[in-house]
Amino acid sequence: MIPRYSRKILKEIWEDNNKFQIWLDLEILACEAMEKLGQIPKGTSNRIKKKAKFKVKEIEKIEEKTKHDVIAFLTNVAKYVGAESRYIHKGLTSSDILDTSFSIQLNQSSNIILGGLEKLSKSLLRIAKKHKYTLCLSLIHISEPTRPTWI
């Protein structure tokens, strides 16, 4: 995103910190589901959730070596979770995480944009009603008057 054209709230959605937080949330949700299915020991997902965190700068350094964003992320999270990190990402592919997180980010962005469009449409309606009977005359190159577009 080009910073000067980006709204802060939308920029934050697409920053690495939010992306990695979504990845972590998805991995924890997968652990919770596997626990309910009896595929991992009971209580594991809660212990993982309590310990799980990441550091963006560390992930970037790891990715320089691994050339793989998800492996770099998982390596960093494993550092904080410890031995039970072996259950994180179990049965998942990188695409499972990447595609799902991308759709979540799109949804987050869409909600912000739709909220803005709703405000815009209300403003346009208010202006249109206010100027419904406002006369507006213009001459362009000495031709007959035409009605210009407002705004």
Enumerate the predicted regions with their spans.
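A helix-coil-helix interface module used to build multimeric assemblies
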Residues: 1-139, 143, 147
